[in-house]
Amino acid sequence: TLVVDPDGLEWSNLPTIDIDEITLLKPDKSARIIAPDYKDIIELINYRNGNLVLDDCRYYVRSRIEEGVRQLLVRRRQKDVDIFAVAHSLNEVPPTFWTFATHLVLFKIKDNPQRLKQNIPKYKELTEKHIPEINNHENHHYFRVIPL
């Protein structure tokens, strides 16, 4: 598993590597990259055979690098990579990511994803069923994995 951490404040249990070392990461090992430069994000397409966690995924999508991230999303299956785009809100998930999403792991949320209505698969089911049920659950850490 390779975790891309925008600020180094999370994932401190993992060793830190440089972006040019990702091809050396063995499938049974985990590591993190901290705050890669926008020009380095394209290097993530060299990662193979593992899980790629994009923590605070909004950080990686700016106009300068969107094509690099898109290439990463498009080629993920050919490179045997599962991508986990982590966000603190549905509204923080860039629209591009929804196109490639197969599942949503949803915890309690306070935001209203109305502006993403056209982007989120199964929007009606999500807003009418899953969000209310999850938010009303007594366990603060309750979550649901929703196939998209």
Give the predicted meaning of each segment:
Residues 115-148:
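Phosphate-binding and hydrolysis-coupling loops of NTP-dependent motor/remodeling domains
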Residues 1, 29-30, 49, 139-141:
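Short, surface-exposed beta-edge/turn micro-motifs
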Residues 18-21, 89, 147:
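Short, solvent-exposed coil/turn linker segments
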